[in-house]
Structure formats: structure tokens, C-alpha cells
Amino acid sequence: PAIAPSVFTASGHLGGSYSEIASTAVEHALSKNLTLTATYLFAGGVRLPRTVNVNMLPPVLLTASNAMQLGIAQPAPQQIGRPVFPPERLARQFDGIYQWQNQAHSTYNGLSLALRRRLANDIEFSANYTLSKAIDDASDFDEQPQNPYALRKERALSANDQRQRFVFSGTFDLPFGDEDEPGATRKQHSLATDVFGNIEVAPILTIGSGRPVDPLLGFDGNRNGAFPLSSRPLGFARNSLETPGQAEFDLRVLKFFLIGGHGKLDLVAESFNVLNHTNVTALNPVFGPSLEPIPTFATPNRAGIGRQMQFSIDFEF
């Protein structure tokens, strides 16, 4: 028999997506140059986009006795006992009718603590810690539900959720020599001053918890026709896996030399992920067709960039 075509369409009830945001903050001056700030932020996403196949008949619980009637000659162990969609369609001239809808929602709740020191005595820094939780029922416009008749079961941690995050950044001048600008009178220099003087160090340390990953069977187990695939292993909810925590240390070092009375030469060295720490950014989400997962299920399969270094020379006159 001929294969019916699939079409993409838009819902007739589309409306504009929008956000509802509320925040409050308290700031306290610990000293002349040091402040502590606590901030709470709520953000709700309303009428967010997602894709739903609206041409499916209601699913039927698959058993060994009705598998042939549902067009599945040899059901996989992961298919037995789960709702499976019949091969017939509501509109028979089409296979899938993938409708772009904006009925998804999201919520974000976050508490941030920030300790900031403004520039004084050649030192400034900022330390920020955030504890947050992001929940939604679709994290992207092309994300399809496992069961179009049970959209509420898609509500889970967002793919963008990161429960904890800490960032420290600062600028420090090494305590050697002076920071005279071109044209100023230079002081007498020792060997330590010549080597370590006029050096500015700017570190950035980022530490964060892992991010959710959606477990998948790796095939269209419930016959919903979704692509990207959305059939999950039995007993697993949406985005129920999590990558390991991440840590990255970046460093920028600048040393300048005064040239003549009005010139300055900057030598800059920058390194990203100085410690060459492996930051896992993705896991293999494929569980496989059996009741036991394949060996590589939930193992790392992608990582962030390794150590990178770059150098530059700037001349000011």
C-alpha cells in the first residue's frame, strides 16, 4: 500500500507567547567597598511553542494477545504493557499531522546571593551563588510529547534546569611595582618589581550542577510517529537523567610595559578551562528495546571544550 504523507500545520488558536516575572532583592553594605545582595526571581512562561501530532487515535495498552491487531508482529519487551497508538489515523489521507501549538508552560524559581567588592586598592571581585529550579512541559518548539493524549505527564524538569551554580570573577594587581600610567614618574625598581610588577590577573571560576537529559528507547516504541523520538523506557519520566556537575576555571593575565613618556605595551595571555577539566555536557539517552538497558545507557557521550590558550599584544600611544 502507498504510504500516506505527513504534513506540518499551525494551530488555529495561536497567540503570542509571554512571560510573567516577579522579583525582589535586598542589599546590605558590609563595609565601604563590600556589599551582599539576596535576590529572588520568579519567571513563568505562558503559551510557549511545541509540536503535537494531532492525527493519532487514542492509544491502546499493548499486550501479547492484541499485538497483531495493532500491527506489531514481534513486540519488543519495552512495548508490552505500554500504551501504543493504532496504525489507523483520524484523517486517513495523512500519516502524521504535526501541529505547531503554543500551549506549553514553564516556571522558574531562583534565589541568588551575590557578594561584590568594588575596585579599591587594585582589587575587585564578585561571587554569585544561585539555587534554582526550572520546570516545563516542552523545552523547545520541535519537542513532541510521548502521548498527545496525556500532555500533563510531560511536565517535568526543564532541559535548561541547573539546580546550583556558583561564579567567581575578579581582577587583582600583583603587589609589586606601581600602576603608573604613561607620562608618570617611575619609581626605583627591584628585580621582583621588574619581573612581577605591572601584572593584572583576572580569574573566572564557574561551578554548576548537572543538567537534565531525556531518556529514550531509541525507536518509536509507542508508534506515535514523533521525530525527534519521544518514546521513553518504562518507569522513566521526562528529563529524569542528569549529567555530572561541571567546573571550569578561566584565567587572564596582563603585563604592561611603559615605553617612553606616552606609550604602553600590553602582553596578554588568556586560557579557558585552565585545568583541562572534562565537563560532560550530554549522556547517551538510548535505553534500548529490552527491559535491561544497553551498556552505554546514561554514559557520557559529549564533553565541553578542553584547555584553550590565546595570546595578544596591544600597544597604546
Model-identified regions with their sequence ranges:
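Short, solvent-exposed micro-motifs at the edges of structured domains
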Residues: 1-317
